[in-house]
Amino acid sequence: MLDDRAKLLLKTLVERYIAEGQPVGSRTLSRAPGLDLSPATIRNVMSDLEGLGLITSPHTSAGRIPTARGYRLFVDTMLTAQREHMNAPSHLPPDQPQKVIANAANLLSNLSQFVGVVMTPRRASVFKQIEFLRLSDRRLLVIIVSPDGDVQNRVIFPEADYTQSQLVEASNYINAHYAGLTIEQVRDRLQSEVEKLRGEIAALMQAAVKVSSEVLTEAQEDDVVISGERNLLSVTDFSSDMGQLRRAFELFEQKAQLMRLLDVSSKAEGVRIFIGGESQVVPIEELSIVSANYEVDGQVVGTLGVIGPTRMPYERMIQIVDITSRLVSNALSHRK
């Protein structure tokens, strides 16, 4: 456990390093407001902090910088609740989910000046509504509406031909008896009830389940929307180290690791922070991510966040992510 003096010194060092980006020495700390310690005492405390793995000396510099462990202690125990003024909108206009997500990613990157990432709403294995539209003989359009309002269309080729009135009757029955159930629940019920259903309804139900499963499980290239990657070019931590910059851009290009990281983040409530390689999913020591879930009608459907250098103003990033998650939740929950 750190005593109050060591905590105050670590907090001051981290804040100074975040603000200036330069290793912090004992002489600089001795002039910091509220830190009434001599340079000799500060050096002793800094030596203790270094021994605990909370700060380190880069190269031959006389100053110190926080380690990932030091940032973690700072974030967990030393952040202030001071609210910053920021030019965030009061709302995001309700729109199609894809448009809301794109707007949110842009908002995150613009406010943070780092990288905004938003996981597109998960396709819950629940359909809110299914409709059938006759296109021609034995050629139907299946329209699937998810709980978050996303609409997917698929063309199917049934063995039998159906009139539009039969299709309307079938969709009305399906929506009345099966809407809100998961695909697995519908499949189980269908197996036990298929003999009781009229032939055309049973056949269309089976087709609907098959199409819904395909829609909800197929991989999508736009599972993560990313905005502001070029902002990292202006961050001295990256612009001076091409190796770090390359690793960061490889992460954004592949997306698979980002998806796993956001999925891990979605397991927690509130704002979550991964510093450096803490997540063990994205082992990039120079990056941190601040993330939060967003909801539709009270149900978590996705995760969003800001990715930037470990030397980021965490208080501000937490506010940006929290505000954006609320805006997205509100926009998606109030679509007409």
From Swiss-Prot:
Taxonomy, superkingdom: Bacteria
Gene3D superfamilies associated with the record: 3.30.450.40, Winged helix-like DNA-binding domain superfamily/Winged helix DNA-binding domain (1.10.10.10)
Assigned keywords, A-Z: Repressor, Stress response, Transcription, Transcription regulation
Biological process according to GO: negative regulation of DNA-templated transcription
Single GO term (MF): DNA binding
Primary role: Negative regulator of class I heat shock genes (grpE-dnaK-dnaJ and groELS operons). Prevents heat-shock induction of these operons.
Family note: Belongs to the HrcA family.
Name of this chain's protein: Heat-inducible transcription repressor HrcA
Species, as recorded: Variovorax paradoxus (strain S110)
Lineage of source species: Bacteria, Pseudomonadati, Pseudomonadota, Betaproteobacteria, Burkholderiales
